[in-house]
Amino acid sequence: MRLSAAPIGAAFLSITMTTQIAQSQVLDLVLPTDNDALFSGDGPAFYQYVERNYKGAKSTPWEGGQYGFVRDPTDTAGGIVYTRFHEGVDIRPLHRDPRGEPLDEVRAIADGKVVHTNLVPGYSNYGKYVVIEHQWGGSSYYSLYGHLSSIAVQPGDVAKRGQRIAVMGYTGTGLNQERAHLHLELDLMFSRQFEAWHNAFFRNDPNHNGIYNGLNLAGLDVARLYLALHKNPSLTIPEFLSGEEIFYRVTLPKSHHFDLPRLYPWILGAGKRNEKSSWEVSFARSGVPLKIEPSDKRVTQPELTYVKNSSIDYSYLTRDIVSGRGANAQLSGYGRQLMRLLTYPD
């Protein structure tokens, strides 16, 4: 019996497309500098220290260069709480010239496209920085490289994994030559309407960096992601974030401008939605959005609908997005503004 070539071609096309989709999910990250002490567990060799003055005692803890709530210790009834969030990791230099200037090459952590370069240190706390867009699983993620001394790429350039894009430096607020480092983030984006939102709420604070302003980017735990990928190279970002604890939930009014589920369709829960439904967004303590589900609760403005129980002031635990204690918890003024960003201009 003679077989038609069409089914074979269709099957081949199906296999090829499936393979391409699977490959598009693969992160295949490389570290951005020669410093690979992260993988040997040598924190002091990998992370740049911070200068701390706590109750008159000065110290230089390397832990302050990690991701998360690692800075500004504060005494509370529940003990010492680190209240300042660090959205990325600070990587120490390995190479310096005789004057002490850092020489480390900074490289793209994965294939992508350069979408932003800030060449004026005073325009951002990041100093000179680069943002590269990566496409994984049909969604855009953004690697950010901060405190650079020089930049070798420009917006629109294709960046290949491991390609030199800059040189490490110490541009930005509060840094000096000794504490030179690369600040690395891997981010989700909140909204493509950020510039209009910023103009409405921060009129006296010029935005020089468009939608790539740090306020519009939610950084995940990139060091933990690197370590997780060493154990499971096929791990995807949705799978990685599925292990994060939900710390608070916010219900948003119905809006046609809600950009987050368009940017990250995987974040949508399976609940059935009708035309009158609001949206409930679940967040990690870091502020990274984890899940979006329809809600029957009718709201006219963003409303806190859940927060993990704690006796500590929530402003210390949530980057000042939630304020108050216990049953008195609510969105702070800044928290309400940030939630407005998600559905702006509604």
Cite the ranges covered by each PLM segment.
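Zn2+-dependent peptidoglycan hydrolase active-site motif and core
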Residues: 101-103, 107-150, 177-179, 183
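Small beta-barrel nucleic-acid-binding modules, principally OB-folds
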Residues: 87-98, 132, 139, 146, ...
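Surface-exposed, glycine-biased beta-strand/turn segments
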Residues: 24-128, 170, 207-346
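Conserved, short, structured surface segments that act as functional micro-motifs
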Residues: 123-133, 147, 157-233
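Membrane-interface motif at the C-terminal end of an N-terminal transmembrane signal
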Residues: 19-23
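Bacterial N-terminal signal peptides
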Residues: 9-18
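Bacterial N-terminal signal peptides that target proteins for export
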Residues: 1-8
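Surface-exposed strand-loop junctions at beta-sheet edges and helix termini
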Residues: 109, 153-154, 159
